[in-house]
C-alpha cells in the first residue's frame, strides 16, 4: 500500500506530499520549501524562513538564493500551464507581505532614515517596472528592497506590467526617471525584452535602462552581449549585478560635465 501511495504522489501533482512523507527521496530544498509556502499564501512562514536564513547571511542573499529561484520555477510552471493565473497573483501578494514583514523588523532595530508614509514613486530617479506579469513584479519588488536595504535609496514600489501598455497614466513617472529597471524572469526572450526596452525608451528618452533577467542559468553569458541583444545600457542576471549596474549608472548621472 505504501509503495502505491508513493507512486501516486510522484505522478499526481496534487498528491506530491505523499511522496515527500512516505518516499525515500530527500526532503524539500530551501527553494522548494519557500515555493510551497508562497504558493499556499503563507507569508508568515516564508518570513520565518527568511529570518532564519539571514541569521547566518543577509536578506539580500535570501532574496538572491531562495526567492528569485522560486520565482523562476513559478514562471517555468506558468509557461508549462501548470500554474494558474490566480496563483501568480498569490505569489506576488504573498512575497509582498513577506517583504513588508521583514522590513518592519529591520526598521524596528534601525534608526529611522525616512519620514513616515509611502515613498513617492520616482523620488530617487529610479523606476522599476515589471515586464510581463505578477512574477516579474514580485522580482522587481525584491530589487527595490535590496536598494532600500543596501543603498538606502528612496525608491517607490515597482510598477506593474500594465504601465508599459498604451495607457498614459504613468508617463510622467517615466519622463522624470534617470534609471529604469525592467524586471523579467529568465524565461523571457531577448526579443521580448528588446520590444519592451523600445517602449520604455519612448516614455523615458533620457533614462538609462537596465534589464534584469532574474534567475538566468546562463550566468556565463557576457552582460555586454545580452545588452546588445536587448538594446539596453546594462543587463543583470542577479540582484547584486543589478545593484552594481545601478551604482554605475547613478555615478555617471551625478558626474560633473567635463569642461572643454
PLM region descriptions:
Residues 7-11, 15, 98-101, 105, ...:
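Conserved, well-folded catalytic cores of nucleic-acid-processing
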Residues 20-86, 99:
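Non-transmembrane accessory domains of multi-pass membrane transporters/channels
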Residues 67-140:
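Long amphipathic N-terminal alpha/beta scaffold segment
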Residues 141-157, 202:
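Short helix-loop-beta junction
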Residues 154-161, 236:
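Short hydrophobic/Thr-rich beta-strand motif most characteristic of the beta2 strand and flanking loop
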Residues 162-224:
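Cofactor-cradling patches in redox/metallo enzymes
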Residues 208-260:
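Peripheral docking tails and interdomain loops at the edges
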Amino acid at each position: 500500500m505504501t509503495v502505491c501511495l508513493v507512486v501516486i504522489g510522484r505522478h499526481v501533482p496534487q498528491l506530491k506530499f505523499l511522496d515527500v512523507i512516505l518516499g525515500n527521496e530527500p526532503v524539500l530544498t530551501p527553494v522548494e520549501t519557500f515555493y510551497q509556502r508562497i504558493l499556499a499564501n503563507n507569508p508568515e512562514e516564508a518570513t520565518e524562513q527568511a529570518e532564519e536564513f539571514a541569521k547566518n547571511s543577509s536578506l539580500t542573499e535570501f532574496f538572491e538564493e531562495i526567492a528569485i529561484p522560486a520565482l523562476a520555477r513559478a514562471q517555468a510552471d506558468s509557461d508549462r500551464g501548470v500554474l494558474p493565473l490566480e496563483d501568480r497573483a498569490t505569489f506576488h501578494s504573498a512575497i509582498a507581505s513577506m517583504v513588508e514583514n521583514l522590513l518592519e523588523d529591520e526598521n524596528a532595530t534601525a534608526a529611522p532614515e525616512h519620514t513616515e508614509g509611502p515613498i513617492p514613486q520616482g523620488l530617487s530617479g529610479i523606476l522599476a517596472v515589471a515586464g510581463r506579469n505578477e512574477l516579474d513584479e514580485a522580482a522587481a519588488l525584491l530589487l527595490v528592497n535590496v536598494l532600500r536595504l543596501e543603498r538606502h535609496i528612496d525608491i517607490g514600489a515597482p510598477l506593474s506590467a500594465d504601465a508599459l501598455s498604451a495607457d498614459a497614466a504613468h508617463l510622467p513617472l517615466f519622463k522624470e526617471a534617470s534609471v529604469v529597471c525592467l524586471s523579467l524572469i529568465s524565461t523571457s526572450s531577448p526579443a521580448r525584452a528588446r520590444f519592451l526596452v523600445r517602449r520604455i525608451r519612448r516614455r523615458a528618452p533620457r533614462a538609462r535602462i537596465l534589464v534584469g533577467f532574474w534567475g538566468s542559468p546562463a550566468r556565463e553569458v557576457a552582460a555586454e552581449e545580452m545588452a546588445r541583444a536587448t538594446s539596453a545600457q546594462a543587463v543583470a542576471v542577479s540582484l547584486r549585478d543589478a545593484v552594481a549596474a545601478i551604482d554605475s549608472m547613478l555615478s555617471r548621472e551625478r558626474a560633473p560635465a567635463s569642461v572643454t
